[in-house]
Amino acid sequence: MVFCTYCGQSFTRDEHLERHILTHTNVKPFKCFTCHMSFARRDLLQRHYTVHGRDQNQNEIPAVNGMIPKSAGRTPIACSNCAKTKTKCDKKFPCSRCAGRNLRCTLRPTRRASKNANRVGATLESATDVPTEVTTVNVEATSKDTRAQENSSSPSSQKSGTPISIGPIMEETPDIAPPQPFTEQVNGGPTPPEFSPDLQESFMDHNLMSGFPGLTNPSKDSSDDGSSPRFLLDWSQMQMPLGYDNMIQSDLMLDPELSFDPNSVPLAPHADGILSIMPELANGGMESLITPFETPKMSRSFVELGLGNSNPAFHSHRHQSMPSVQSIPNSGNEMPAMIAAQDGWSAFRCTPTLPSSSCPKTAKLNLEQLEETLRNHEGWVSWSPRWEDNDLAGGGDHLTVMQLHESTRDKLLAIMQSFLHKALETHREGRGTSNGSHSPNPSGASNFVLLPPGRVLEYFLRSYSNSFERYFPLTSRSTLDANELMHCYNDRAASILVLLMIAQGAANIPSPEARMLTGGLTEACRISLFDLIERNIIMSGDPIVLHSALLFTVQAAWSGDKWQMDIAMGQRGMYFAMLRHSGVLDRSSHAASAQPQRTLEQLWTDWIQNESRSRLIYSWVMVDQDLALFHDTAPLFSVTEFGAPMPDADRLWHAKSAEQWSSTFERVHEFSSGFSSVGSGARPLSLRDLFRHFLDDDLIPMGIEMTPLQLRLLLHPLQSMVCQFSQLLSCFAPATYRTSISVHPNQAQPSSRNISQSSTRTRLAEVQALLQRWFDLAERYLKANPLCALMQTNLILFHLISLNAVTNFPEIERLARRENVDGTYHQLLWLHKRCIPDVEEAVFHCGQIFRLVRSMPRGVRPPWWAGAIYRVALILWTDSLTHKDALTSTSPQGNGMFPSPIAGPSFAIDALPPDHALIVRYLTKREGVPCVTKLDGSQMGLERAYPVLRHCVEVIDEGCSTRFSDAIRGKLERLSRG
C-alpha cells in the first residue's frame, strides 16, 4: 500500500497514486493538438479527440470507434466474462474476446453491489440484439412544480397528449450511423437545424427522460471517507468546454450511471443559438463530450472587453445585472435573516435590542447561497457591474491587477471546493446522511460549482485594490499578482488569502450576486483558516496566515452580518495574541549589513521583506483602533508594545524596480556628507519612539517628516487616552441633576470624588490639546502634499476621536433606545448635559465629518464610513431634542427654561474648512447658527430631529450600498419614525 504525500490518502497500486498526485501538482502533460487543451491522463485526451473528429495525427476518427460513454464519471471497466477469468478486456462492446468466443458480453456496474442495491442496473444486450430505432416521444406541457414532483417520486405514466416528433433518438448500439452532413454556409459553419416555435418551446421545456427510473431515484455518492469534496465525485461535476455546460438540463444529470446520449437529451432554453458556433453539436458528433477538470477557455476578444472600460459593447449592458430572483433560487431568503439579526448587534444600537439567542443564524445560509450562486454559471458569464469606473477607482486605479492565469483559477477552484465542502459539513452536523456523503441538491440542480469567470474575479480584485489597499497598503511594487501568491506560497494559506481578497472586493459592489459571494466566501475561509492554524500551530506566525486573518477580521467586522461581526470581535484577541507571540512586534536585532557584497536586487528584496513585516504589524494596529472606536471600547494594543520600525514612505513601497527604489531611498533617507543611504539599513522610528517625540513636541525641531500612514498610527495612543478618561468621567453624575433630586442639597461638600472628577477633566483637556497638536501636524503635511484618501480617513478619525472627548456616545444610544427615560423635563435637561457636555465643539466635528465623507469617491471610502455618519446622526439628533422643546415650550422673547438661540449668521458647518472665520467665531464666541447642506445645495437647520435624521439617511444613500451601510440606514430610518 502506498500513500499520497500531499493528503495522506492510501492506494493499493502505484499507477493509481501516480494518477492521483496529478490532482495536487496540477501537471497536465497531455495536450490536444487542435485546441491546445491540457489533460492529466492519456485516455482523457483520446476521448477528447472525438469532439474534434480527428486524432493527434489529424486523421479522421471513424464513427464506430468502439468507445462507449463513461459511467458515473469513471473510465469503463472490464466486462463480466473478462473479469471472471481475469483476462485483459479491450473495453469495447462487445469486447473482442467475447465476440471471438461467441459469448454474451455484459458490462459490469461501476459501483459495489452494497451501494448499488437501490440503483437500477444498466445491463446492455449484445450489439446484434439492439436494433436502431426511431422513436416518437409524447410531450405534455407541465409546470415546473409538476416536473419537480415527478423527479422526486416514482415515474408515472403520462396523460394522453398530442405526440410531437422531435427527430430520431438513437439508442446505444455498437453500430451508430454517421451523422448526415449539414449544408455549409458562406462562412464555413454548418447550418443549424430548424425548429418551429411551438416545437422548440415543447422541446426545451419538457423533461423527455421522466420515464427513466434512474432519474427519479438518484443515489448517494460513493465516497466513504469524505476526504474529497462532493462536487468532484459524480458524473455531472466533470467540467465541459465553455458553452456545453449550459446546454444540458441539470435534472438529467442526477444519476451517475445514466449513459450520455446527446441525441436524446433535450437542450436547455436558448441553447439552440449555440449550435451555430459549435459544429460538433450541430452535426451530432457528441459521442464523448466529457473533458478533464479544466477551466473553460474564453476568447481573448471577450476577456479584453473588461469590466469598467469605455467599450460601447460593455456600456450597453452597464446597468444590467443577472436576474437574481430567476437565476438564483432562494435569493430572497438572505435579507430577512440579516435584517432580523440587526437588533442583536453588539454596536450601533439605537433601536431596542434583541438577545443573541433570538437572532436567526446566518452562517449556513451564507454558505448555501454561495453554493447556489456558484452553480449559476450562465448568470456569472453575463454579469456586469452597475456603476462607472470613477466610482470604483476614485480617479485612478491604486494598483495594477495582473490577469489571472488559467492554472491559477483551476487551482483556486479546486481548493475553494474543499473549503466549501468543509464549511457545509461543519454547519450541517446532525442533518447529514448516515455514511457522511451528500445527497443530491434538493432543488434538483447540479452539484457542480464554478468560480465566476476570470474577468469577474479580476474586477473584484481591482475593487479590493482600490478600496482595501488604500487604507491597508500591504501589496508591494504597485502590482497585485494573484498568480504569484498561488504558486509561491502554501497552497491552502494562499488560497484563503486570494479568496478573501475577492470577497473583500465583491463586498463593495452593489449587487446581490456579489453579496452572496462575499458572505459565503468569508464564512468558508474563516473555518478553513481556523482549521489551518489548529492543524499546524507553526502557521500562526506565518505572514500569509496573519494577512488572511487581517482580511477576515476587517471583512467580517463591517459585513453587516451579526454573527460575522461578533466572531470578528471575538477572534481579534486570538489573532492579536498570535501577532504578539510571533515576536514581530519587537525591533529586529540582526545586523543591518551582514553581507557587504550584496547586489542592489538583494538589498531591495530584503527591504521589501522587512517592510512587509512592518506594514502587516501596523495594519493590525489600525484594525484595533477602528474596532475599538466604533464599539466604544479601549484598544487591546498598548503603544509600549511596538518596538518594530513603522512603515516607510509609500514611494519606496510602490517602486517597481531596484533602480527606482534606490534613487527614491536616497531622497527619503538622505545622509549628510554625501554618503549613500542605500544598504545602510535606515528605517523609520517605531510607534513607541515616535509617540515619545510627539509628547515632547520634538517632531518639527528634529525635522521628522510624517507620512499619512504614520499620522494614522499616531492616533492610536491618543484614542486610548481619550477612551480611558471618558470612561472614567462617565462614572460621575452631573452635579445639576444630582442636586435637583437630592434630599439635602445643602449638605453637599467638596470630597475626594469631586477632586478626582476635576483632575480627570483636566487630564482629558490635556489629551484634547495633544489632539490639536496632531491636527497641526496634519495641516502642515497637507500644505506640502496633496490630499489623499488615507489622509481624508485620518481627518475623519481625528474628528471621531474628538467627538468622544466632548460627548458620551453610549449614553446617547441609551437615550435613543428610551432606556430608563421617563420623559420628565428635569431628566431631559440632565440627559442632554450628560450626553453632550460641549455642544458647539460636537456640532463642529459632526459638520467636518460630513464634509470629509461626502468629498470622498463613493467606491473608495473606508469600510466603516457609514458608521461615522451614524455617530454624527445620533449626536445631532440628541442636540435637536432640546431645540425642539425650545421652539414649543418657550416664549418668543426667549425667557423660557431653555436659552434663546444665539444670534449670528447662519453657515454651512459641513461645507467650510476648520479655519474659516465663521467656524472660528462659532467655536470661540459661540455665535452663529450652524446648518447642513442638502443634496440640492440648500441649507437646513439642526433644530428638528426628523429632518436631521432624514438628511443623514440621504448622505448614506450617496455612497456605495453595502450590507453594513444598508443596515445603518435602516436603523436611522427606524429611529426617525420613533
From Swiss-Prot:
<feature type="region of interest" description="Disordered">
    <location>
        <begin position="426"/>
        <end position="445"/>
    </location>
</feature>
<keyword id="KW-0804">Transcription</keyword>
<keyword id="KW-0863">Zinc-finger</keyword>
<dbReference type="InterPro" id="IPR036236">
    <property type="entry name" value="Znf_C2H2_sf"/>
</dbReference>
<feature type="zinc finger region" description="C2H2-type 2">
    <location>
        <begin position="30"/>
        <end position="52"/>
    </location>
</feature>
<keyword id="KW-0238">DNA-binding</keyword>
<keyword id="KW-0805">Transcription regulation</keyword>
<keyword id="KW-0479">Metal-binding</keyword>
<dbReference type="GO" id="GO:0000981">
    <property type="term" value="F:DNA-binding transcription factor activity, RNA polymerase II-specific"/>
</dbReference>
<keyword id="KW-0677">Repeat</keyword>
<feature type="zinc finger region" description="C2H2-type 1">
    <location>
        <begin position="2"/>
        <end position="24"/>
    </location>
</feature>
<keyword id="KW-0862">Zinc</keyword>
<dbReference type="Pfam" id="PF00172">
    <property type="entry name" value="Zn_clus"/>
</dbReference>
<keyword id="KW-0539">Nucleus</keyword>
<feature type="DNA-binding region" description="Zn(2)-C6 fungal-type">
    <location>
        <begin position="79"/>
        <end position="105"/>
    </location>
</feature>
<dbReference type="InterPro" id="IPR036864">
    <property type="entry name" value="Zn2-C6_fun-type_DNA-bd_sf"/>
</dbReference>
<feature type="region of interest" description="Disordered">
    <location>
        <begin position="113"/>
        <end position="231"/>
    </location>
</feature>
<feature type="compositionally biased region" description="Low complexity">
    <location>
        <begin position="152"/>
        <end position="165"/>
    </location>
</feature>
<dbReference type="GO" id="GO:0008270">
    <property type="term" value="F:zinc ion binding"/>
</dbReference>
<dbReference type="GO" id="GO:0005634">
    <property type="term" value="C:nucleus"/>
</dbReference>
<feature type="compositionally biased region" description="Polar residues">
    <location>
        <begin position="432"/>
        <end position="445"/>
    </location>
</feature>
<dbReference type="GO" id="GO:0003677">
    <property type="term" value="F:DNA binding"/>
</dbReference>
<comment type="function">
    <text>Transcription factor; part of the gene cluster 29 that mediates the biosynthesis of dihydroxynaphthalene (DHN)-melanin, a bluish-green pigment forming a dark layer in the conidial wall that protects the conidia from UV radiations.</text>
</comment>
<dbReference type="InterPro" id="IPR001138">
    <property type="entry name" value="Zn2Cys6_DnaBD"/>
</dbReference>
<protein>
    <recommendedName>
        <fullName>Transcription factor MYCGRDRAFT_87993</fullName>
    </recommendedName>
</protein>
<dbReference type="InterPro" id="IPR013087">
    <property type="entry name" value="Znf_C2H2_type"/>
</dbReference>
